[in-house]
Amino acid sequence: MSSSSSHNSFSGSKTNAAEGQNSIDGLSLKKTTSPFILTAYPSNEEKEVKETDIVPDENKVNELDVHKQSTEFSKQESASNDDDTNIQLIPENNMKIVVPALILTLFLAALDNTIVTTALPTIAEDFNDTSSSSWIGSAYVLASNAVLPAVGVFCNILGRKIVLYICIFFFMLGSALCGASQNMIWLIVCRAIQGLGGGGIISLVNIIISDITPLRTRPMYSGILATAWGAALVAGPIIGGAICQRTTWRWIFFINLPSGGIATALIVVFLHLLPCERTSFKKFLKTFDFIGLVCVITGIVLILLGISLGASSGKWRRANILCYLIIGGCLFVFAFIYDTFTKRNAVLPPPFFKNRSSAALLACSSFFYLNYMLFAYYVPQYFQRIRGDNPIMSGVHTIPCAAVLCFFCTTVGMVLRKLGRYLPLIYVGYISCVAGMGAMICVNATTSMSKVMGLTTIFMFGSGFLFLPPLIAMQATFPPAMTSMATATLMFIRTMGGSIGITVGEVIFNERVTQSFDGNTTYAQLSYKQVERLPQELQIRVKNTYASAFRVIWIFCTVVMAIGFASIFFIKSRPLISNAQSVPAKKKGDSDEKPAEKV
């Protein structure tokens, strides 16, 4: 049937039941093999919308050219703030089942960022290898960062579900192999495999939430995801410490198998996404940005590898470390330049960096997450190294932080849904985080525990405002067809900021402590048990030195947060407006895997 025969008018229109068409404000809707909701984001001026703007032709579903879409979007944006009508198709899902399954999957992937931190001494002792133990955590973070740029591209080529299943498979496989590891090298390699899946899961869950929810109600669900993410990062050291003290450290990884299996089964059965035309292998070879992907991943790994080696050895002028940093930086710059001119689906789409608002959002998210990961990593270290807490008690003392973060992540999602604007929330979050980091500068070795716990909640209060709004703002800045790429790009830049933050914090801490002890690096590596066994006079000196090193870290964080706050002024405010209309459910026997059909 010709697509031109399917247009109806909302005002005084006649419904053609035989053709199975519905119409809203002149926008013709087709029945598909999957139930969906039409979500329209109306503009200030009405424009004629073709049927292909709503349901693309089957032969062109996967020919998404980010550059063309973003160029048209930028031209329209320059003429008016919201001068075009963006259409989003929303599949019907049982949100009471799908959302908890996605949350559990995200929680497990996020948990593995920090769950090993309190178990590192035990694992190192078991394998009799302390020199490589830091790579247990670094391997996961490096692999997670490396896979993020490719997630959005693979989603547009293969579809969300297939990519999600692949990522879950790698995460579960890596978890099983980590639990069965017999030496340190085995464990580190398997942590990298686990990280490939974990990084993809974290990005994909956010992408899928944006696919199954309209923009105006999305903050509520995204707020729940942000709560799960923040809670996992804070709960990781507690759970890891408890497992190590009650049973073997191997259950830190084995625990993912039954939990992940349940979540995967629910996702397979209950998650419904819009049909996706499968691309041919020939078309995949023609459109995928292989050069950009290889350069980005290699560049990231080399940069973080160089920073990590420099931090652990303290010898930044070594030839190998300088080569890692220089070559990695050159590859990353080359990838960005290449993606600016390539006609393929770029791994780092230039429009996200050329658009002033989206570039500011990327900077805002990166600076915040750099501080958040430093905070989440070094506050438990303060409790252990200076206050003498064991891993469990250190986690207990961070419970107020976790409670504040979870409460405000959820609350901000609901407020954002009601308010319809994200910029005021970002301002509140950044101001609170700058104040919280500034207050932490006053903490020393003798500060009362209640005061320390109170000051830490100030930063966590602000953090609750900064997980979700930048993501929603990024999605609102571009058309729905670019949502997956926008989400993946923000997640990649944000996570990379966190990875760099942890490494820079390690550099600051090691350098400060080493200088205080005349170049002796031993004191920077002491565990809380070893500190408590030192002679009283030396113990006091070591703790004061640690407190001084932490103070330098908090000063660094405060400066970075202030720079991030300046980037907010370049973010463009957009109202989150959407209208939804249900379309008849799919017929019996229809499959979600089939592409949309004309009727």
From Swiss-Prot:
Q: Under the GO molecular function aspect, what terms does this record hold? A: transmembrane transporter activity
Q: Where is the composition biased (Polar residues)?
A: 14-27
- What PROSITE patterns does its record include? MFS
Task: Tell me which UniProt keywords the record has, alphabetically.
Answer: Membrane, Transmembrane, Transmembrane helix, Transport
PANTHER family given in the database record: DRUG TRANSPORTER, PUTATIVE (AFU_ORTHOLOGUE AFUA_3G08530)-RELATED (PTHR23501:SF102), MAJOR FACILITATOR SUPERFAMILY (PTHR23501)
Q: Where in the cell?
A: Membrane
Recorded source organism is: Schizosaccharomyces pombe (strain 972 / ATCC 24843)
- A Pfam family matched by this chain, by name? MFS_1
Q: What is this protein called?
A: Uncharacterized MFS-type transporter C16A3.17c
User: What Gene3D superfamilies does the entry give?
Assistant: MFS general substrate transporter like domains
Task: Please state which protein family the record places this protein in.
Answer: Belongs to the major facilitator superfamily. TCR/Tet family.
Enumerate the residue ranges of region (Disordered).
Answer: 1-27, 41-86
